[in-house]
């Protein structure tokens, strides 16, 4: 875990033909109805002038509370019967698919029945944990901070400033929420780990081992690609834990582990949802030139359903780690994404992200921020003061005891769950005259 990010915190069928991979999943049961800030990579950046793999990566050794191998033997033993059943139920299918006139790699999980929803979970501090559901099949994007941290005994995972203590984390909260809302080990279609920061994928291994996603997506990561030493934290440790769990999933029940995508041409048909993966650096230039922050290696997701859309922007930044030097990522992503109805703000709504041209291009009518109003720049929510946009900063929503904000997609549009018990305000210093807005 890392402090700057942490607390700002079946039936399955798979086949590959002509570059098209198609998977199908039918759930065993329909989904149940939905009813502080500490800092790691989200801290104000330090003056950098003053600062000093793939699926074959080795599993980390045990350290402190959790390591990649924890629970593997127990999971193998307790789940062996279920794995055999899953293997018996797997059936292969294939079809040629085109999305928008472009050949695409499409994973299909048709489901049976049930609502189409995006759940953005409240977390401790600022972190991303987003549950998708449609027709009784589910997907999980990220999973917030987990319990455990490297203890420094393994030279691959040294103790570093800014790593969240091992006792802090939302493991029980996230796993419990998923179970409560109907996720089982037979109906989780895919897991997407957007990038190797602990406030996003620290619980990836727990989610994979408990809920057995049929496809696991996550970009490759290595500490050697990070040029800013202050941006390393426990990235490699949490990434290696996820990779070890993904390898276990491949061996145990035949999961697919996908770490490379072809531009913006990877889609998942999840019930009535189309989920399009949006890599921030499609050419993976960081593998050659390096990059200052793992955020810049990330993958976002555009969701379309019933003629409405959402962009889940992970930690998309338009700057390098200094939060000053612009990199053009938002312009490139905006061209790929286009206008959306709902935006999960990039990088928790911090000032490295969501610049005016990006907000104008996406033009969302709802902004969900996995962070706090207290550090929100005016540009993220400028339209809120004119009454044109719904805004939910999840730190304030969570402080009101609300477990999530749920967006329900239907032929009538998008409706949002009630979070009126939460309250906050914002001062718009860039407005003339100065403006205040209160909820």
Model-derived features: positions:
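Metallo-beta-lactamase
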Residues: 187-199, 343-347
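Sec-dependent signal peptide cleavage junction
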Residues: 26-37
């Amino acid at each position: 875990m890392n402090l700057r990010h942490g607390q700002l915190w079946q039936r399955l069928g798979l086949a590959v033909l002509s570059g098209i991979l198609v998977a199908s999943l039918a759930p065993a049961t329909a989904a149940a109805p939905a009813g502080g800030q500490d800092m790691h990579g989200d801290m104000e950046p330090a003056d950098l002038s003053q600062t000093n793999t793939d699926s074959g990566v080795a599993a980390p050794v045990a350290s402190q509370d959790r390591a990649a191998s924890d629970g593997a033997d127990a999971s193998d033993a307790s789940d062996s019967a279920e794995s055999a059943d899953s293997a018996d139920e797997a059936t292969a299918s294939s079809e040629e698919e085109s999305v928008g006139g472009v050949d695409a790699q499409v994973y299909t999980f048709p489901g049976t029945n049930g609502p189409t929803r995006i759940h953005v979970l409240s977390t401790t501090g600022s972190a991303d944990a987003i549950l998708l559901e449609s027709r009784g099949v589910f997907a999980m994007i990220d999973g917030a901070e987990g319990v455990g941290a490297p203890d420094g005994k393994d030279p691959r995972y040294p103790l570093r400033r800014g790593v969240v203590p091992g006792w802090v984390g939302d493991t029980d909260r996230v796993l419990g929420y998923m179970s409560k809302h109907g996720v089982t080990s037979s109906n989780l279609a895919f897991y997407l780990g957007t990038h190797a920061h602990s406030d996003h994928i620290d619980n990836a291994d727990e989610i994979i081992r408990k809920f057995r996603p049929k496809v696991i997506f996550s970009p490759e990561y290595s500490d050697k690609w990070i040029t800013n030493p202050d941006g390393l934290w426990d990235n490699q440790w949490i990434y290696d834990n996820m990779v070890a769990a993904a390898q276990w999933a491949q061996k145990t029940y035949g999961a697919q582990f996908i770490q490379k995508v072809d531009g913006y041409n990877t889609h998942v048909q999840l019930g009535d949802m189309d989920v399009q993966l949006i890599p921030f650096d499609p050419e993976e230039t960081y593998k050659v030139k390096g990059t200052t922050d793992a955020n810049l290696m990330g993958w976002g997701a555009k969701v379309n359903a019933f003629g409405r859309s959402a962009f889940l922007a992970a930690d998309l930044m338009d700057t390098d780690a200094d939060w000053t030097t612009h990199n053009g990522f938002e312009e490139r992503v905006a061209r790929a994404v286009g206008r959306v109805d709902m935006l999960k703000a990039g990088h928790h709504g911090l000032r490295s992200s969501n610049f005016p041209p990006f907000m104008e291009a996406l033009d969302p009518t709802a902004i969900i921020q996995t962070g706090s109003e207290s550090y929100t720049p005016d540009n993220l929510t400028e339209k809120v003061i004119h009454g044109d946009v719904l805004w939910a900063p999840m730190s304030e929503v969570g402080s009101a005891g609300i477990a999530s904000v749920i967006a329900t997609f239907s032929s009538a549009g998008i409706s949002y769950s009630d979070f009126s018990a939460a309250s906050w305000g914002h001062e718009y210093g860039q407005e003339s005259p100065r403006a205040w807005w209160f909820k």
